[in-house]
Structure formats: structure tokens, C-alpha cells
């Protein structure tokens, strides 16, 4: 598994040390253990977790912007935990309303010694941070119009919302409010995952 993690991450532009890879393997071990009792994820075997959780998360590593990152609807901590592990210079706030999932995230943060992660049990739409986040991550959170309405209070003029999607969401893009624009988009190829993946980068403001 360590070799799969290192080689898969390298294909995504992430240079994992052996220590990083061992910590990611430890994360998946903890997830598998907790999952037997708390049903945190539908992916139950470790080998599938490598692609569906860790490498899928690391696929957006190169698109992070700024130091303050929010992961909304983080679930069991993806994509936030793997990204925080390989980006210790960034500060990650992992947000979910589900108590058992945030308890797992908090456990993983302690177990892995992640000093740059703040787990937060809350409804995203109720948050009013003192400062906007630089990047807001969302993996399978909601259709784009609903996502943007929910995360708007977390965003400033330079915030980038990274929406991780499966198939290209043309109908959702057609329904975007005019106060948002697509700043960029990318097709993602995740090693070991034979499924469509794309990333939509959104910013507030109308393009000129």
C-alpha cells in the first residue's frame, strides 16, 4: 500500500515522503476501524480507500490557493485530512454537521499529530468567519448553485471555491447565479480510479 500511495501521489504532482505515506496508511487504518462501528464511508476495503479517498483528495493539491482552507461537508475528513498532511504550511478548517464524523476527524487529527487542522461541527450556512477563507473545498457536497449559496458567507473577493465533481456538471453550470463565475476548470485523472472526475474553480464577481 505504501508504494501505491507514493507512486499515485507522484502522478498527481505530490512528492510523499515515506513518513507521509505511513501516516496516510495509518489514517486509512483508523478509518477502517471506526467504520466498522460508525459507518463513516461506503468504501470499506483499504485498497479502494487509497484511490477513492486519499488519491482523489490529493488530485486537487496543486490548485489550493492561499493559507486558509475550508473543507465543507468534509465527512470523514476528505479531501481535507490528506491535503493537510502534505501541506503543513496551510491552515485547514474541516466542517461537517455530523457529530460522529467530526469525532473521527478530531481523533485522526490527534492520532496523526496534525497541528494545522481545526475540526468544526457546524452547519456551513450558519458560519460567519471573521476573515474569508482563501480556498473553499467541496467534494460531492451539493449542486453548484446550492453549494455557492451555502458557502457565500465564507468567501471574499479573492476566494476560490474548488468544487470536486464526477461527470461535467453542465446543467449546474447553466444555473449558476450571475454573481459567480467559472475562473477555471480541470479534468482530473486519479490513479486507480476508473471514474470521471473534474474540478470547477469558481470565484465571486462577473468576469470583464
PLM regions with names:
Residues 90-93, 167-208:
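Active-site capping/gating segments
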Residues 15, 91, 116-118, 160, ...:
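Conserved beta-strand segments of alpha/beta enzyme cores
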Amino acid at each position: 500500500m505504501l508504494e501505491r500511495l507514493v507512486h499515485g501521489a507522484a502522478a498527481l504532482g505530490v512528492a510523499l515522503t515515506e513518513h507521509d505515506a505511513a501516516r496516510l496508511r495509518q489514517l486509512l487504518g483508523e478509518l477502517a476501524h471506526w467504520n466498522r462501528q460508525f459507518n463513516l464511508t461506503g468504501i470499506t476495503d483499504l485498497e479502494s480507500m487509497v484511490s477513492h479517498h486519499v488519491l482523489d483528495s490529493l488530485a486537487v493539491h496543486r490548485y489550493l490557493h492561499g493559507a486558509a482552507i475550508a473543507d465543507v461537508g468534509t465527512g470523514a475528513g476528505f479531501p481535507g485530512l490528506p491535503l493537510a498532511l502534505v501541506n503543513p504550511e496551510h491552515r485547514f478548517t474541516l466542517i461537517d454537521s455530523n457529530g460522529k464524523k467530526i469525532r473521527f476527524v478530531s481523533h485522526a487529527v490527534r492520532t496523526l499529530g496534525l497541528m494545522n487542522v481545526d475540526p468544526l461541527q457546524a452547519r456551513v450556512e450558519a458560519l460567519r468567519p471573521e476573515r474569508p477563507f482563501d480556498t473553499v473545498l467541496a467534494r460531492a457536497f451539493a449542486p453548484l448553485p446550492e453549494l455557492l449559496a451555502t458557502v457565500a458567507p465564507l468567501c471574499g473577493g479573492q476566494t476560490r471555491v474548488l468544487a470536486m465533481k464526477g461527470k461535467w456538471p453542465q446543467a449546474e453550470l447553466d444555473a449558476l447565479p450571475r454573481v459567480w463565475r467559472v475562473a477555471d476548470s480541470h479534468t482530473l485523472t486519479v490513479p486507480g480510479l476508473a471514474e470521471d472526475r473534474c474540478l470547477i474553480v469558481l470565484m465571486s464577481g462577473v468576469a470583464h
